[in-house]
C-alpha cells in the first residue's frame, strides 16, 4: 500500500511527464510559426511542481506582427492537455517591457531558454 508521500511523488512525476510532452509540442508549434526564442519559467523551472502546475512560456516572435497579434495566433494554434500560459513579444517590445515590467524581468531572470533560432541541434 502506497503512502501519502509516495502517492504525491507519483502524481508529481506524472505531471512532469505531461508538462514535458506539452512543452515539446508547444516549442514545435512556435518554431513552425517562426519563433526567435522560447523560454519556460515559473514552477516548471523553479519548482515545486504540483499536480495542477501549468506551463509558463515567453516567446519572442518576428516583428512581422505585434506581440498582441502573435498572442492571438499562437493561442489559436496551441492544443495541449495541460494549461499553458504563453506571453508573446517581438524583440523591440520585449526590450521596452524589460524596462517597465517586473513580470518580464523576473521571467527573463529565472526562465530557461528551451529554443533559440540558429541554435538548433
Where on the chain are the PLM-derived regions?
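Catalytic core of pol beta-like nucleotidyltransferases
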Residues: 1-37, 45-51, 62-121
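Short beta-strand->loop micro-motif that forms the acidic, two-metal-ion catalytic signature
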Residues: 56-59
Amino acid at each position: 500500500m502506497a503512502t501519502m508521500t509516495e502517492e504525491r511523488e507519483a502524481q508529481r512525476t506524472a505531471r512532469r511527464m505531461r508538462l514535458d510532452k506539452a512543452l515539446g509540442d508547444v516549442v514545435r508549434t512556435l518554431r513552425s510559426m517562426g519563433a526567435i526564442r522560447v523560454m519556460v519559467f515559473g514552477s516548471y523551472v523553479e519548482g515545486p511542481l504540483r499536480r495542477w502546475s501549468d506551463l509558463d512560456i515567453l516567446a519572442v516572435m518576428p516583428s512581422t506582427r505585434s506581440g498582441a497579434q502573435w498572442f492571438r495566433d499562437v493561442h489559436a494554434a496551441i492544443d495541449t492537455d495541460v494549461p499553458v500560459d504563453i506571453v508573446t513579444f517581438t524583440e523591440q517590445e520585449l526590450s521596452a517591457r524589460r524596462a517597465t515590467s517586473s513580470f518580464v524581468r523576473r521571467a527573463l531572470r529565472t526562465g530557461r531558454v528551451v529554443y533559440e533560432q540558429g541554435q538548433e541541434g
